[in-house]
Structure formats: structure tokens, C-alpha cells
Amino acid sequence: MKILKNVALLAMLFMSIVAVAQQDNVLLDRSFWKGDPDLKTVNQKIAEGNDATALNENAFDAVIYALLEKADDAIVKHLLSFEGNPVDKKTHDSRIYLHWAAYAGQTEMVNFLLDKGSSVTKLDSHGYTPLAFAANAGQKNKALYEAFESCGVNLLNEKNESGANLLLLVSSSLSNEEELNFFTRKGLKLNSTDKDGNGIFNYATKKGNIDFLKLLIKKGVDYKSSNKKGGNAFLFAAQGGRGYSNPLAVYEYLKSLGLDPNIVPKDGYTPLHRLAYNNSDPAIFELFLTAGADVNLKDAEGNTPFLNAASRNELAMVKLLSKTVKDFNTTNNEGQSALMLAVQRNNPEVTEFLLNNGSDAEVYTEGHRSAKDNKGNTIAYYLVASFDSRKPDEFDTKLKLLQEKSVQLNTTQAEGNTLFHLATKDNNLGVLKRLSAFNIDVNSKNDEGLTALHLAAMKAENEEMMKYLISKGADTKIKTDFEETVFDLASENELLQKQNTSLNFLK
């Protein structure tokens, strides 16, 4: 117990140090780099105390932002001269600077990093080398690929974890025969496929350039065959690209080729499952529904298109898909219903719609026993998990909606946690205060033998949450199963030590 506690405290201390390091650091403000600062300005900011090597909470740093915003090469090289910025520094998603330089199409910086000995084989957390990462982002700069070639990289061997080569990865961004020929002349085969048998036509449909798709068909590319998992191009079209969704015309074109919109692969994850998350064009949904796509079909994880829509999509689309829902209280493999997902991830409007149109509130309150997911959490757990400090009004509205349906908020959740435990674990005083009126036992122990106050003593960044719990009746004398008092736990909290927080109120 003590070992786990100390590990948790060290992790929190590290995050605190990172937060302090990047607080008010203008070099970690992307808008600063969008302003195209010169080297003199950058040096001035560094002299003022802005750390040129610090990573923010998402592991981005000044070098990355300078590369992404195409700052002058002299500035990037200067930043790379700092001891804390080695060429293979591990950053966001385990990427090194070569990933970012290639992604941004910064050929001169790519050459500079290669000359400095940067790894060309380093994989990011998604299994992409620097060059594969660039191709997947749509980089078509010939000089970029030739820079890697000159450094000994065999373009034919560059693939991601799915076995997609550079041609497949970049294909959704290609628009004409000249661009296509650059890659085929390098030896990349037009009929190459990934491990699942997906060819260039499928990959190109992610950003469906219909003229380019027609060019591929003219060149004899196979577009009709299903892949090894039983999928077709509709699945890739539904996937879209980063910040891009295909319009209706692309789906109509694929249908005109004789491809089936109602394709059901082996894992059950259909195009409708993917589109249900964020498609906002009712005509696209109608195309699939007319073709027989089923909003009730479960994929391998037990999710239906309707469950996906309830978790993220706008109310109008949820209403549209709800017309053919057989059971509003269907759950996925984790025991999560549409209402649970909507309460956690979507807006109050969708929550209210589900409560009033099919999500039977009695299911959640009958006999004062709330329906639980497979871990033992009720809808109240999902309410606490939904809190966003930027949108507190949404939480308050959802809370009111659930109160109107007499949902019990003092039911014990998974692992013996009360809502007080959950809010304290998240260090969320705002939620804690909102829950104080619901007759929750503030001194209840969870399965680890900890009260909410114990957790606050271990995790708190200051005394405020502990004092609030005490004001609500939390007992400072209750010990853990290891005979530790609240004072003992707080005394070992390095975040509190760092701030010289007085703990006399716990004695």
C-alpha cells in the first residue's frame, strides 16, 4: 500500500513540476510562434526566463512549435543547441524532432537533423517512423522523400504497423497522375496492400477525391474485392482524415460502383458505427439506412451505431438514428447504456432526450437500486466523470435532470467508492461541493480501506479540499487498514511539503 501510495505521489509531483515549468512560458504558447518571431525576440524571451527545453503537459516543446509554425531555420537550429533538446528527444506520442520536421515538410531541417545523426527508424507510439508519419499526414514534397533516401532509407520498406507502405499512407492526399507517378517510379507498386488486404483505392477514399479515384480505376486498381476482414472502401470513406469528413457525393460515387454501403466486416464495426460519432449530414445517414444498415447492430465491443451517436453526436443526429432503435437500454460489453455514455460525454440536450424518449428512468431507480455497468458503477459515476471545469453549467443541468428522475446519488460505486471518493481522486473540489447535499457518507471506506479524506491527504495540492471534507463531517481520526492517520498521509504528500502547508488542523 505504501509503495503504491509513494509511486502515486511521485507521479503527481512530477506533473506538478511540469505544470510549474510550463506555466506562463511563452515559448510553449503556439500563438507566439504563429506571430513569426525573429531570433532576437526568441532570445529575449529566453533571457526573460522562458525555458527553451521545457515540455508542456502534452509533451510538446518550443522546437516542435517552431517546426510546426515554420519558424526561420536559424531559430530552430538555435533551440536545438540547448542541452535539453537533443535531436532524438522523446516528445508527444514518443516522437522525435525528425517526426515533426518531416510532418511539417521542413526539408532543410530534415537534412539538418539527419546530418546530426537523428534516428530514421524510431517508431512513435502509433508505430510510425518519421517518414511514414509524414506520408500519413499527406506530405508530397519530393525533396523530403529524397532526403531520407540519400540517408540510406529504403522507401519500399517504410510501413506502419498495419503493413501500409508510403504509397498507401499518402494516397488519400494525392490528386493527380504526376503525384502518383513519383511514388510508383520509386518502386512502390500500385497494387500493393496492407496486412488486411486493403489497397490504394480503399486508402484513397479516406479523403475521397473522386477524380483521383476514377484515375485509379482507369489504371486497373482493384476496388471491388473485400479485404481480409470483410470490409470495403465504405469503411475507409467513413473514417475520413484528420479534420476531414467526406461529403455525400463520395458515398454516392462508391455506391454507383456497385459497392455495398451496408458492409458488415467480421468485427461487426460498420461504416454506420463510425459515422454515428460525428456525422452531421442526415442525407449520409439516410443513404446507409436505406441500404439496410442497422442502428442496433453490435460490434465486437458491443457498441451499436446508436450507442456511438449517444456518446458524441449532436441531438438532431441522435434523434434521427433513434427512429429504428429497438431498445434504448441496450448496453455494450462493459454494461454501458446510451444514457450512461451521453451523461459522461455528450451534452445535456442529448441526456434529456434519452431520459424522455425511451431510456426508462425506472430502470435506474426501481427499488432505489440503480442499474450498474459491469464494474458496478451507476449513472451517478458517469455524471461525476463528465465534469468539465470549462463547462460547469452542463454538469449542473445534467445533475438537475437526473434529480428530476429520482436517480440515487449516494449509491456505492465500483471498488466501494462513493461519489466523494471519485471527486477526491480527480482532485475536483467543484464536484465535491455540488455533491454535498445528497446524503453521501463522508466517512465511508472504499475497498482499499480509504475514506475520501485519506485520498485528499494523499493527492491534494493544498489544504482546501481536506478542510472542505472536514467541514462536512470527515473524521480526521479514522485510520487506514495500515493504521495510518490522515495526518500521516498528508505528512508524506510531497506536494504539500513543497508548499510548506501547515497540517496542524489534522492533529
Question: What residue spans do the PLM features occupy?
Answer:
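Ankyrin-repeat boundary/"N-cap" motif
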Residues: Q23-W33, A54-L67, K89-H99, L123-A135, ...
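Ankyrin-repeat-protein effector appendages
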Residues: A21-P37, L155, S256-D260, T324-D327, ...
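Ankyrin repeat domain, specifically the short helix-to-loop turn at the C-terminus of the second helix
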Residues: Q44-D51, K77-N85, N111-S119, E146-L155, ...
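N-terminal leader/linker segments that initiate helical-solenoid repeat arrays
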Residues: A19-G84, D88-H92, S125, S491, ...
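Solenoidal tandem-repeat scaffolds enriched in leucines and small polar residues
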Residues: G138-H273, N278-F285, A291, M317
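Ankyrin repeat A-helix N-terminal signature
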Residues: G35-D36, Y65-D72, W100-Q106, F133-N141, ...
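Intrinsically disordered, low-complexity segments enriched in Gly and acidic/Ser/Thr residues
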Residues: A249, S256, N262, D267-T270, ...
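Bacterial Sec-dependent N-terminal signal peptides
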Residues: M1-N25, S502, K507
